[in-house]
From Swiss-Prot:
Protein name in UniProt: Glutamyl-tRNA(Gln) amidotransferase subunit A
EC number, UniProt record: 6.3.5.7
NCBIfam families given in the database record: gatA
UniProt similarity note: Belongs to the amidase family. GatA subfamily.
Catalytic activity: L-glutamyl-tRNA(Gln) + L-glutamine + ATP + H2O = L-glutaminyl-tRNA(Gln) + L-glutamate + ADP + phosphate + H(+)
GO CC terms of this entry: glutamyl-tRNA(Gln) amidotransferase complex
Physiological role: Allows the formation of correctly charged Gln-tRNA(Gln) through the transamidation of misacylated Glu-tRNA(Gln) in organisms which lack glutaminyl-tRNA synthetase. The reaction takes place in the presence of glutamine and ATP through an activated gamma-phospho-Glu-tRNA(Gln).
GO biological process, one term: translation
Domain of life: Bacteria
Record's subunit section: Heterotrimer of A, B and C subunits.
Keyword annotations: ATP-binding, Ligase, Nucleotide-binding, Protein biosynthesis
Amino acid sequence: MLSAARLNRLFLAGELSAVEIAESALSRIAQVEPAVGAFITVAADHVIERAKKLDARRKAGDTELGPLAGVPIAVKDNICTSGMETTCASRILKGYVSPFDATVVERLRAAGAMIIGKANMDEFAMGSSGESSAFGVTRNPWDLERVPGGSSSGSAAAVAAGEAPLALGTDTGGSIRQPAAFTGIVGLKPTYGYVSRYGVVAFASSLDQVGPMGRDVEDVARLFEVIAGPDRRDATNAGRTPPALKFGGEPSLSGVRLGVPKELLGPGIDPGVKARVEEAIAQLEELGATVEECSLPSTEYALSAYYVIAVAEASSNLARFDGVRYGYRAAQAGGLHEMYSKTRGEGFGTEVKRRIMLGTYVLSAGHYDAYYRRAQQVRTLVVRDFERAFERYDALVTPTTPFTAWKIGEKVDDPVSMYLGDICTIPVNLAGLPAVSVPCGFVDGLPVGMQLIGKPFADTQILQIAWAYQKVTKHHEARPALTEEGGR
């Protein structure tokens, strides 16, 4: 699969038709999807129909086809799409078709993109492995016995496996960046409020953000510019448009000051991962950046605070799924309350039920102050740590994850161990900051990601830093050795 930028150029120049591009993507999906499991829905008829319309517009001389015209894209299945199911990878929403498009989907269509399908995910975005989907496990294209990360598991796997050049994911505590790191692609978690959440099924409303995933920084930046911007339908939208990004010339980080939080590059980080990230930091220095060690002392409390705030918001948001208005409804219920109980018990998976119960507990009258209020106080401390760091530094550098992808099933019975894998990404969500994961090497054949964290609304700045790093390295060009049959 060619890059999104190149596909767009070839299509606009008439060297490739949109139908040819769509058919090529569908052929690749047919080859590898049985092994990878990146999609819940493959919208073959839809994408061919869309491609024919784009071809007709180009032949008619339309010069405003858009920066994503002719580009296939996968959309995470918690983002509403009219005409396609939106299941959130849950039995409780199986068969549900939204009557409207999310704002980000509207913008994709306006930019000429071809939505090729809905990507698999952890159920209701609650997970870090891609194993909790009601529609099957997604596998890592680099090692089919390992997880691709989550919760945007299918989005990451689809891009890494060459099924689509771009994908949309959502990130609540690392759900774009962690799978991007595990699968060797680029993933951006934008500043909270930069991208509309209208039409995105909520997990934790104060943490969720939609973002782009792709094989290189230029493609991710192109998609970010399409989806970001004001939206009055989203009360949490910041009403800001990002500055235009221009890549070119010799890569240089002269004058850029980078901080490396000691809490996130010390004990608990796999030695191989640490070595790759330290090599990447040395490369940033060679590009002209000034690098210093810094401290984010409240980081040690971030994980605990997150798993109070996130589950509390989830228990509230998921109360709407009761079997009355839409989605799955349990049969043979003796009354209304039994119908609610059976529907939710049968419709939700284990991880979702675990988080709903925890959220209900921390919001209860006897525990609100001890847990939820205290977690919000810790969140304030995390924000202040970042504010102090950014008084001195332009961006911060950390590993994206403390270890590489684990084997499927390895952590299913130990959710706390899985939660600990988000230690580098969760503080960013608590503070509402932008962060991008870029490939920085391999450990035992498995990809490693470096995370660049920026100031609020400095998304374009961290993308520029990531681009400079990408220009002098080749890690993003590596491809998994999937055969035509989808095996290794």
